Curated annotation (Swiss-Prot):
Glycosylation site residues: N155, N172
Broadest EC class assigned to this enzyme: hydrolase
Membrane topology: Multi-pass membrane protein
UniProt signal peptide: 1-28
Protein's cellular compartments: Endosome membrane
Upper classification of the organism: Eukaryota, Viridiplantae, Streptophyta, Embryophyta, Tracheophyta
Active site, renumbered: D387, D440
Protein name in the entry: Signal peptide peptidase-like 3
Gene source species: Arabidopsis thaliana (Mouse-ear cress)
Lumenal side: 29-194, 274-276, 343-347, 399-429, 488-492
Length: 540
């Protein structure tokens, strides 16, 4: 392992910082609601459905609002063409807890939450002739409107739904100004299969595969020569000697534990101090890391066939001597990162974010490595617990899922942490994004990269090695993650809950069956034991 030249050392530190912020969560950036245990009784057996509330103010259509149907009441159509458009009117009294003072025939009734049961509000609105009832919540969440124990037989024949406080305030503002507000309600059905999740899965697996095979893809001749030398070194001395021109950071057992603890501290800081300026700083770090990762990838691809292009160099202030090609590529990458930063709130910004993120992760997996299965077990088992705790257990302590809140960003400013891949759900009427955190790619990616190196050094046929099977296991783990996401109605999943058993568990099982687990567990351990003061220390 070589000593660090200053620019590379600074970049490695940046990579480690961004890795600490590599969230491990698969989620859907989507509308959601607060679940409650609701009683079922005759007339109170409806499934909760998300509702689109189209609205017009003096004939001008505005952005649609989101609602949630009650467990009782009439069903809504699934397409707008089958829905009816009615004017909106506030009830009197506003809570709809007693007989209404005026008729509401041909109107959609608006009521505030509180003072009586939801079923009672619906009965009074229906008795006044309302075509539907919208209950305005006293907070931004949408709560499930169920039935009371006494509602043993309920017959409400109008649609009933809840909208958020901000949606109610927007409607109220228009109506206070004596504007004519009309509403149209329908509940679009989501597609049974989310095709964009498949694209995200391919991106994640593709990133890991490309990173693991990067040397073979960019310089196969040199890679074969390097692995031949490594194989001789391992067989004769039990040690590994990395490319002297390539900076490698091997994670140790202590470093693996420290890494997860530090990541948890970062996560809590983001949870408590999430603000636009904090996210700005992290986004700038992301841009720098992604830009340099993109530079490394573009340079490697160009030099694979055209090495002579890097011969001409130029000396620059502060930067020192660099090739003209590298300078031009840096300018292009800088322009790309700046353009994305400026346009990061646009509907197409996900493309630039994913490109920068993938470039960053491919480069990170070249810089940071696992030396053996022992360190991999410590790191991935700690990450396994870390993921489950911050997604599923943290709500019991912090009243919210810390991981999901941080991944979704600050809704008040529109800023979000960019350390995740995301793709818009093109075929979903509700829109939103499917997302996967960097951690769900980097943690298993470190293990799969180790498997690839091990297979190469041992000259394994692909079917008799570890790389192919761990890659398949990773894909299966991601499939299970999105199955869990689907079964839990889009609520964020700790992806490592599924990925770690399908990758690390599979590696251990294969090692046991092949009688190689001891070698995998202690692989390269002699290098650490024979370490001398003159040699660079592995990263802690």
């Amino acid at each position: 392992m070589s000593s660090f030249d200053p620019p590379n050392h600074r970049y490695s530190a940046l990579v480690l910082i961004l890795l600490l912020l590599g969230f491990s969560v698969a989620a859907a950036d989507d509308v959601s609601w607060t679940e409650d245990s609701s009683l079922e009784s005759p007339g109170c057996t409806n499934k909760f459905q998300m509702v689109k509330v189209l609205n017009w103010v003096d004939g001008v259509e505005g952005d649609f609002l989101t609602g949630l149907t009650a467990q009782f009441g009439a069903a809504l159509p699934s397409v707008p063409d089958q829905a009816l458009r009615f004017p909106a009117a506030f009830v009197d009294p506003l809570d709809s807890c007693s007989h209404l003072s005026s008729r509401l025939d041909g109107h959609i009734a608006l009521s505030i939450r509180g003072n009586c049961a939801f079923t009672e509000k619906a009965k009074h609105a229906e008795a006044a002739g309302a075509s539907a009832l919208l209950v305005i919540n006293d907070k931004e969440d949408l709560d499930e409107m169920g039935c009371m124990e006494k509602d043993t037989s309920l017959n409400v024949s109008i649609p009933v739904l809840m909208i958020s406080k901000s949606s109610g305030d927007a409607l109220n503002k228009s109506m206070v100004d004596n504007k004519n507000v009309e509403l149209l309600l329908y509940a679009p059905k989501r597609p049974a299969v989310d095709l964009t999740a498949g694209l995200l899965l391919l991106m994640a697996v593709g990133t890991v595969v490309v990173a693991s095979l990067w040397s073979e893809l960019t310089d196969p001749d040199q890679a074969n020569e390097s692995y031949s030398i490594l194989a001789k070194d391992v067989s004769s001395a039990g040690t590994r000697k990395d490319d002297p021109e390539k900076e490698i950071l091997d994670i140790s057992v202590t470093g693996a534990v420290f890494f997860i603890v530090t990541a948890s501290i970062f996560l809590l800081l983001l949870f408590y101090f999430m603000s636009s300026w904090f996210v700005w700083v992290l986004t700038i770090f992301f841009c720098i890391g992604g830009m340099q990762g993109m530079h490394n990838i573009i340079m490697a691809v160009i030099l694979r066939k055209c090495r002579h292009l890097a011969r001409k160099s130029v000396k620059l202030p502060l930067l020192g001597t660099m090739s003209v090609l590298s300078l031009l590529v840096n300018i292009v990458c800088l322009a790309f990162a700046v353009f994305w930063f400026i346009k990061r709130h646009t509907s197409y910004s996900w493309v630039g974010q994913d490109i920068l993120g993938i470039c960053l992760m491919i480069t990170a997996l070249q810089v940071v490595r696992l030396p053996n299965i022992k360190v991999a077990t410590v790191l991935l088992c700690c990450a396994f617990v870390y993921d489950i705790f911050w997604v599923f257990i943290s709500p019991l302590i912090f009243h919210e899922s810390v991981m999901i809140v941080v991944a979704q960003g600050d809704s008040s400013t529109g800023e979000s942490i960019p350390m995740l891949l995301r793709i818009p759900r093109f075929f979903d009427p509700w829109g939103g994004y499917d997302m996967i955190g960097f951690g769900d790619i980097l943690f298993p990616g470190l293990l799969i990269s180790f498997a690839s190196r091990y297979d190469k050094i041992k000259k394994r046929v692909i079917s008799n090695g570890y790389f192919l099977w761990l890659t398949i296991g990773y894909g299966i783990g991601l499939l299970l993650t999105y199955l869990g996401l689907y079964l839990m109605d889009g609520h964020g999943q700790p992806a490592l809950l599924y990925i770690v058993p399908c990758t690390l568990g599979l590696a251990v099982i294969l090692g046991l069956v092949r009688g190689e687990l001891k070698e995998l567990w202690n692989y390269g351990i002699e290098e650490s034991e024979s370490h001398t003061p003159e040699d660079p220390m592995p990263v802690a």
